[in-house]
A protein has these predicted regions:
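Bacterial N-terminal signal peptides that target proteins for export
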Residues: 1-13
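C-terminal motif of bacterial Sec signal peptides marking the signal peptidase cleavage site
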Residues: 20-23
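Bacterial lipoprotein signal-peptidase II cleavage site
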Residues: 25-35
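N-terminal carbohydrate-binding accessory modules
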Residues: 36-113, 326
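Acidic/histidine-rich helix-loop elements
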Residues: 71-98, 126-130, 168-169, 284-315
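An active-site-proximal structural segment forming one wall of the substrate-binding cleft
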Residues: 93-113, 124, 128-158, 162-199, ...
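Active-site region of glycoside hydrolase catalytic domains
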Residues: 175-312, 321-341, 369-372
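Aromatic-rich peripheral "rim/lid" segments of glycoside hydrolase catalytic domains that contact
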Residues: 346-419
Length: 419
C-alpha cells in the first residue's frame, strides 16, 4: 500500500517464480579412433501443473492460498533526490536483505504464495533503463521464493507518483510502464507459470481515494492494457504467463459498476488474467494507528462504543460478494493482493490481538469461500526476517485456519455482525 508506507512499521506477496528452463548443452569432437557416441534422446518432461492449466478460481485458491507479502523490502524507497540509486535500498525501512530463510519459513508456516512488491523507478536512468544490478537482485529474491516452492507475484509497486490516471500524464506514464515491463518480462521470460506479474499498484489520483471519473477509469485501464501488451510481446513463457491487473485504486467498489464492463484488458491468450483488489476495512480498526477508540471488531465485540457501526462481518460479505459476482462467477480469478489488520500501539485497545486475529481469520475464510486468494500484508511482524523464526503464532494460526474454518460465533453482540 502507499499510505505513509510504514505506519509504525506496519504498512498495509505474490505467487512464485520458476524453473529456469535452462538447457545444458554439451559437445565435443571425436578423434583418436574413438567411435562417435550415439546421442541419447532427451525425454520430454511431464509438465508441472501450474496456473497455465489450472484456470478456475477454486483451483487457483487451492494452489495459491493463503499468501503473504514481502513488504517494506524491495519496495523500500530512500531519499528521492539521490536517484537513480547505485546500490540496493531494500534495508532502509528497517528490514534485513531478503534471504532464503524467510521464504523457507513462509512455506513452513503454511503460505503457498508470496507477493514481492518492487519499486523500479528509483533504479532507472533518464531513458527508463533499469540498472542491471537491480534486475539481478530481484531475480535472486524471486529464486529464493521458488526454491521454497512458493508461487510468486512480482509487481511495479511504489511507482504511483508517475502513474497518474489522467490524460495529461497518460502518454509519458504509458511509455515508462511499457519500458519497465519489457525489461522485467525479458529478464524472467524463461520462468514458468509459478511466476505471475502484476502490472501496477493502487493507481489513483494523487492524495485521493474518491470515486474516479470516467477519464480516470479509462486511463487506469489503459495502464493495464499497456502492461499486458508489453509482457506478451516479449515472447517465451510470457506469451501465456498469468498476469494480474488491478481495479482502480484496487477497490472492489470501482469495478464494472463504476468503471464499466470492460474492466479486463484484451489479451492474445485466453484465461490468463486475474483481477487484484486490496482490503483494509474498516480503516480505523485495521490500520489507523492514530485512532485509539475503535479497537474491537465484529461478533466478538463486548463494547459497542469500541466497534465501528459498519465494516464488520456483514460488510465483508457484501463487498466480497461483489468480487464473486463481477469476476469469480464469470471465471476470472481474484487476488486480494493486500489485506491486513494490526494491533493498536496505544490506548485502551493496546495489544488487541484477539480482535485483529479474529478479523484475519474471518476475512480469510470469507475470501477463499468466494474464490478469492487472500495475501496478508506483512512488513516483518509475523516471522523473523533474518532467521525465519516465528514471531506471531496466533496470526499465522488465524490465517491458515481461516482457509477452512469460519470463526464467527453463532450469536452476535448487539448489531456488530448484522450491518
Amino acid at each position: 500500500m502507499d499510505l505513509g508506507v510504514r505506519m509504525h512499521g506496519r504498512v498495509m506477496l505474490a505467487a512464485a517464480v520458476a524453473l529456469s528452463l535452462s538447457a545444458c548443452g554439451g559437445g565435443g569432437g571425436g578423434g583418436g579412433g574413438f567411435p562417435t557416441p550415439t546421442p541419447t534422446p532427451t525425454p520430454t518432461p511431464t509438465p508441472t501443473p501450474t496456473l497455465a492449466s489450472l484456470g478456475t478460481p477454486s483451483q487457483v485458491v487451492q494452489e495459491m492460498a493463503p499468501g503473504i507479502n514481502l513488504g517494506n523490502t524491495l519496495d523500500a524507497v530512500d531519499t528521492w533526490d539521490t536517484m537513480p540509486y547505485s546500490d540496493s535500498k531494500e534495508t532502509v525501512w528497517g528490514n534485513p536483505p531478503a534471504n532464503q530463510a524467510i521464504f523457507n519459513a513462509y512455506a513452513a508456516a503454511g503460505f503457498k504464495s508470496v507477493r514481492i512488491p518492487v519499486t523500479w523507478y528509483q533504479y532507472a536512468d533518464s531513458n527508463n533503463t533499469i540498472a542491471p544490478f537491480w534486475l539481478a537482485r530481484v531475480k535472486q529474491v524471486v529464486d529464493y521464493a521458488r526454491n521454497a516452492g512458493l508461487y510468486v507475484i512480482l509487481n511495479v509497486h511504489h511507482d504511483g507518483a508517475w502513474l497518474i490516471p489522467d490524460t495529461a500524464h497518460q502518454a509519458a506514464a504509458d511509455a515508462r510502464l511499457k519500458s519497465f515491463w519489457t525489461q522485467i518480462a525479458n529478464e524472467f521470460k524463461d520462468y514458468d507459470n509459478h511466476l505471475l506479474f502484476a502490472g501496477t499498484n493502487e493507481i489513483a489520483m494523487p492524495n485521493t481515494y474518491t470515486t474516479p471519473t470516467q477519464e480516470n477509469c479509462t486511463v487506469q485501464k489503459g495502464f493495464n492494457q499497456t502492461f499486458v501488451d508489453a509482457v506478451r510481446a516479449t515472447g517465451g513463457n510470457n506469451a501465456s504467463r498469468t498476469l494480474v491487473v488491478q481495479l482502480y485504486s484496487t477497490n472492489i467498489d470501482y469495478g464494472p459498476d463504476t468503471c464499466g464492463e470492460t474492466t479486463l484488458p484484451s489479451d492474445s491468450v485466453a484465461n490468463r488474467l486475474m483481477i487484484e483488489m486490496h482490503w483494509y476495512s474498516p480503516f480505523d480498526f485495521t490500520i489507523n494507528s492514530n485512532n485509539t477508540t475503535i479497537w474491537q471488531w465484529g461478533a466478538l465485540a463486548t463494547d459497542l462504543s469500541a466497534v465501528e457501526t459498519w465494516g464488520n462481518e456483514g460488510y465483508t460479505r457484501q463487498e466480497f460478494d461483489k468480487a464473486m459476482t463481477d469476476f469469480v462467477n464469470k471465471g476470472v480469478p481474484v487476488i486480494m493482493g493486500e489485506f491486513g489488520s494490526y494491533p493498536k500501539d496505544t490506548g485502551p485497545g493496546q495489544g488487541n490481538e484477539t480482535y485483529t486475529n479474529y478479523w484475519a481469520q474471518y476475512n480469510t475464510y470469507a475470501a477463499v469461500t468466494r474464490g478469492i486468494v487472500p495475501m496478508w500484508w506483512d512488513t516483518g511482524s509475523i516471522l523473523d526476517r533474518n532467521t525465519g523464526a516465528v514471531k506471531d503464532a496466533g496470526l499465522i494460526n488465524a490465517l491458515t485456519t481461516g482457509m477452512t474454518t469460519n470463526p464467527e460465533p453463532v450469536s452476535a453482540v448487539g448489531n456488530a455482525n448484522n450491518d
